[in-house]
Amino acid sequence: MGRQGNLEELWCLRMPEIITPIITPFTKDNRIDKEKLKIHAENLIRKGIDKLFVNGTTGLGPSLSPEEKLENLKAVYDVTNKIIFQVGGLNLDDAIRLAKLSKDFDIVGIASYAPYYYPRMSEKHLVKYFKTLCEVSPHPVYLYNYPTATGKDIDAKVAKEIGCFTGVKDTIENIIHTLDYKRLNPNMLVYSGSDMLIATVASTGLDGNVAAGSNYLPEVTVTIKKLAMERKIDEALKLQFLHDEVIEASRIFGSLSSNYVLTKYFQGYDLGYPRPPIFPLDDEEERQLIKKVEGIRAKLVELKILKE
């Protein structure tokens, strides 16, 4: 009984996190709308999001100049210091400069994806890229592993060779791939980048999810985590599957563009525009997207997850 009680206590203490890769709002003339960004950050933190991942894919990070990445950091920092600051890019000098500038901010850490586009980069050079960032960073460094987008898989074995990561965001649907980071790097914080694995991650001993859908359904993602941690698995999965339906609907029209529409629909405020070549949805696409998710919203209201 004593051992069982200790296990139950450890289970309750281990609380995985929901991290939002925060959307970057742009004006019609393609500038960052800092006021909208702050409103969004405030809402997310108020609704229980644990940290904000700034300049990620959902935030259209690859389209941002170094100056804009820093601008995003400053705007979000006005709201919270619970920030992982993504600095990566194709110019290592820019990434180094951003990492060094982050010393002026009391944040959680910096992150970087692997250098993308360039084919057949050697593992040796990828390792050198990340080790260089670790050497100059005043904060803990997180790996952002997104093989589909970057063409490089910095898997658990390579991460162990690099040897300086505090954590990883692994954007891949294969949970075994993500679990391998914890197996080979037991002291590393391991986050899944999949929205569809929130309930699963909360049940596996991993450290949480970096979930794009938490931009527009923070209440849902936080509740899925809570239910899973309370071992109310049936309820957690019921909510997870509703969340998955919204994610699937967003992908029909392009998830990066849909995120702006869905945030306005579910959260009630406007996040402006994405940045081309991520174009905004046209009126008909918006109408079709909302039609696909309005029944889900009604169910979430019925479950008292969302307000009327």
UniProtKB/Swiss-Prot annotation:
Its EC number is 4.1.2.55. It holds the Pfam family DHDPS. Homotetramer; dimer of dimers. The active site is at 169 (schiff-base intermediate with substrate). The gene is eda. It catalyses: 2-dehydro-3-deoxy-6-phospho-D-gluconate = D-glyceraldehyde 3-phosphate + pyruvate; 2-dehydro-3-deoxy-6-phospho-D-galactonate = D-glyceraldehyde 3-phosphate + pyruvate. Belongs to the DapA family. KDPG aldolase subfamily. Pathway: Carbohydrate acid metabolism; 2-dehydro-3-deoxy-D-gluconate degradation; D-glyceraldehyde 3-phosphate and pyruvate from 2-dehydro-3-deoxy-D-gluconate: step 2/2. The keyword Membrane does not apply. This is 2-dehydro-3-deoxy-phosphogluconate/2-dehydro-3-deoxy-6-phosphogalactonate aldolase. Substrate binds at residues 57-58, 144-146, 169-171. It comes from the Archaea. GO terms for molecular function: 2-dehydro-3-deoxy-6-phosphogalactonate aldolase activity; 2-dehydro-3-deoxy-phosphogluconate aldolase activity; 4-hydroxy-tetrahydrodipicolinate synthase activity. Involved in the degradation of glucose and galactose via the Entner-Doudoroff pathway. Catalyzes the reversible cleavage of 2-keto-3-deoxy-6-phosphogluconate (KDPG) and 2-keto-3-deoxygluconate (KDG) forming pyruvate and glyceraldehyde 3-phosphate or glyceraldehyde, respectively. It is also able to catalyze the reversible cleavage of 2-keto-3-deoxy-6-phosphogalactonate (KDPGal) and 2-keto-3-deoxygalactonate (KDGal).
